[in-house]
Amino acid sequence: MKMTKLATLFLTATLSLASGAALAADSGAQTNNGQANAAADAGQVAPDARENVAPNNVDNNGVNTGSGGTMLHSDGSSMNNDGMTKDEEHKNTMCKDGRCPDINKKVQTGDGINNDVDTKTDGTTQ
């Protein structure tokens, strides 16, 4: 099948326009709320922004109630590093990151009564 340059140009233009129209139809131009979400992110009132809609069946009176902040221990006290040396603080931070310098000093594998604190996590002592 032999095509002339004009026919090739016409076919290419038709396919380009058709694919562009298909992409525009899929984008959902009528329901696009990107500008509303951007306005809501900037602090403006945007009632049509989906980000401002509360989840279904949520009672806002029960959110963040009680005394104190949300980062408290179960006994209501906050965590501090009072009484820790700089070395202890460093080891504690390293272990929180998963890079404990001496895992046997931080991990208790038994009940702590039978002097099994210095055993490895698999129960061995080597």
Curated annotation (Swiss-Prot):
Q: What are the UniProt keywords, alphabetically?
A: Signal
Which ranges form a coiled coil?
none
Compositionally biased region (Basic and acidic residues): 84-105, 117-126
Q: Where is the composition biased (Polar residues)?
A: 54-64
Give any Pfam family that matches: YbgS
Its domain of life?
Bacteria
Signal sequence annotation:
1-24
Compositional bias, Low complexity, is annotated for 27-47
Region feature Disordered, mapped onto this chain: 27-126
Question: Which InterPro entries does the UniProt record give?
Answer: Uncharacterised_YbgS (IPR020363)
Q: What is this protein called?
A: Uncharacterized protein YbgS
Give the species: Escherichia coli (strain K12)
